[in-house]
Amino acid sequence: MRWLLFLYLIFGVSLISRAQGGSPEISNLPKGPLNQLSGQVFLSPSLRAIQNDPSTNPVSLWLEQGKELWLGQAGQASCAQCHGNIEKMRQAATHFPKWSVKQQKLINLEDQILTCSERTQRPLKGLENTDVLSLSALLHQTSAGLNFQIVPKDETLQRWQLELNEGAKLFTTRIGRMNLACTHCHDLNIGKTMRADVISPGHPTGFPIFKLSWQSMGSVDRRLRACYSGVQAEVPAPGSPELRQLELFLKSRAQGMPIEGPSLRR
């Protein structure tokens, strides 16, 4: 599996890049409120076709690796030994980010995967580690079709609300040399063109994503850091509290929209 992934990263991306075509015409966007549209709606027709075909969608390689990691190898600790069949994890991706009482911080699904890897004495390194993203992709695919259920029903609710409020502030705060906030693109300019792309509402329903400009999979954490860079602001370190707060707000903002599973993006 790993050698297939390696070969794909060398040769496969350029083939998809040739097929990507332009962004969809604004006039072709569905009617109705633009702020409720998935990012998949804003893909070009050629990329949407690749997204919908498992035989050409590069995400399939990460899903296959995720399945192998879940089951593990004989004699080694595995996810399945603790959690059983992957289908039992149908709800898993719907609950993150959440407040961890033990760690006293907001964590997302990739953080939880890293924590679990330490418990099995097979620690993974880094949020964008291929194994971490493969397991994240598998869990998000398993939760596809379900809505986010991120509001806690326990004693963490009060702290969770404080974190959510901070995320909302970050979403509307101008930053960087361009003096822009998230809301200026993803609320006020949805459907307009920027850098050859049509601006989407920025709902995190299709993560982790395979982004052509990255030539790899990436998490919400990575995408948010890219946005900081895009407006020429100081980029937070991976896993920073503000990134988790923003992710929490974005998923709260997407309440009522189904998780789509790992997706392709330009």
Segments (PLM) and residue ranges:
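Acidic helix-start/capping segments at beta-turn-to-alpha-helix junctions
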Residues: 79-89, 96, 154-158
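Short cysteine/histidine-rich metal-coordination sites, predominantly Zn2+-binding motifs
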Residues: 94-103, 198-206
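Surface-exposed interaction/gating patches
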Residues: 67, 140-193
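Short Cys/His-rich "knuckle" micro-motifs
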Residues: 88-92, 192-196
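N-terminal carbohydrate-binding/catalytic regions of secreted carbohydrate-active enzymes
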Residues: 63, 69-71
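The canonical Cys-X-X-Cys-His
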Residues: 74-86, 135, 167, 177-189, ...
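Intrinsically disordered, low-complexity segments enriched in Gly and acidic/Ser/Thr residues
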Residues: 187, 193-211
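Post-cleavage N-terminal segment of exported redox proteins
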Residues: 3-8, 13-62, 98-165, 212-235, ...
